[in-house]
Regions:
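N-terminal beta-strand motif that seeds the catalytic metal site of vicinal oxygen chelate
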Residues: 1-18, 47, 61-64, 121-125
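A short, sequence-level motif marking secondary-structure junctions
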Residues: 53-57, 124-125
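Short, charged/polar surface micro-motifs in flexible loops or helix N-caps
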Residues: 45-47, 56-58, 69-73
Length: 125
């Protein structure tokens, strides 16, 4: 049952206007709706509910990510739109913030305006 269901992501925000500017304006996701509980955007076949929270502490780990065909091109595109990537100490590509894992996968991390850690990944098959 769940294997064929559509995945819905959830992230919290304290400021839905700022979140919409980021997720729609900078990430290029399609706006779906905005009500008293959540802002909703569409990412491919997946829905992301950006829950309106009065108080929360963002997690220090990745809460949501996207698998992309070319992580370097996507990082550059997002940089042009004002998205800054995290430069963790273990990341060897200090310019773009892309980490290459021991098996060759590539990962880059960034934060939304509320401090939620998001990621891009490109996987070798």
């Amino acid at each position: 049952m769940l294997a064929s269901g559509k995945l819905i992501g959830f992230v919290p925000t304290k400021d839905s206007r700022r979140a919409r500017d980021f997720y729609e304006g900078k990430l290029g996701l399609r706006f779906v709706s905005d009500d008293e509980f959540a802002l909703v955007v569409q990412a491919g076949p997946s829905m992301i509910r950006i829950a309106k929270a009065k108080d929360f502490k963002p997690a220090q780990y990745t809460v949501m990510g996207w698998e992309v065909a070319d992580v370097e091109a996507t990082v550059k595109w997002l940089n042009q739109r004002g998205v800054e990537f995290e430069k963790y100490p273990f990341v060897e590509d200090r310019e773009l913030g892309i980490w290459t894992t021991p098996n060759g996968d590539k990962v880059a991390w960034f934060k939304d305006p509320d401090g939620n850690v998001l990621s891009l990944s490109q996987h070798v098959r």
